[in-house]
Amino acid sequence: MIIKNAKVFTDGCRFVEKDLMIRDGRIVFGATPQENEEVLDAKGSYALPGLVDIHFHGAVGHDFCDADEAGLQAIADFEASKGVLAICPATMTFSEEILNGIMDVAAAHKNEHGADLVGINMEGPYISPKKVGAQNPKYVMAANADMFRRLQARSGGLIKLVDVAPEEPGNMDFIKECHDEVRISIAHTCTDYDTAKEAFAAGATHMTHLYNAMPGITHRAPGPIIAALEEGAEVELITDNVHIHPAVVRFTFNTFGDDHVILIADS
């Protein structure tokens, strides 16, 4: 396929109108056109690779935690219609019993159309009761490796990210024990700089919605954000101009580098 007159993002950080081709499922430039090849006129529309959202909760009136296949399919279809072709929806802070139902639906999902369900982001319940945000404090608990493994088995191995507040009793041990089985993210936390550094040394590699639901930066208490920067962590940003000021978004890209920043919807 040839896509003509598309706005393409270039190395100069600008959109430039040009033609591109699809070969073996990949975008290429400068390939030789084939005889009778399908041609699509983008008419100045943007042409981008399919996006991946690793942290959102639902769409079009459906929540991933509803544990409903029809709702999950509606979410997947909507995400694909907006250019998000792979999704890793997030669970909320719930009991193991409720989480079991969510994992069952995810494991049974067929990915026949819409965005592919490529993982689950387990945002709770191993968080700080002092930084619950929109989570339900009733279900906050200490991180439990056995519980995580039961949920992982139930999901068919779909859990790719687990959020942990490392300062809570027992949670550092969870990081040490499970970091080889799943990616660990520091989140919904009151942790200080030293504890965050310890968590990264123990195996955490990620920070959930940087700046939100965590201590900020001061010159005498650098907190988890500076620890994440020093340790080269991957960090999420909610770039809706509400959760974070645009200047802070620019600051984060300039300090962490674009290869460490992950834009999320958290919708």
Model-derived regions: residue spans:
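Residue-level marker for buried hydrophobic side chains located in beta-strands
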Residues: 50-52, 185, 261-264
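Active-site-adjacent C-terminal substructures of enzyme catalytic domains
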Residues: 195-267
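Divalent metal-dependent hydrolysis catalytic cores, especially in the metallo-beta-lactamase
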Residues: 57, 73-101, 115-128, 155-167, ...
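Active-site glycine- and acidic-residue-rich loops that bind
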Residues: 95-101, 167-169, 185-189, 238-255
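Di-metal (Zn2+ and/or Mg2+/Mn2+) metal-binding site signature of metallo-dependent hydrolases
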Residues: 45-67
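Divalent metal-coordination and catalytic microenvironments
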Residues: 6, 25, 44, 55, ...
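Histidine-rich, glycine-flanked metal-binding segment
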Residues: 1-48
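Divalent metal-binding pocket/active-site signature
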Residues: 122, 129-145, 149-223
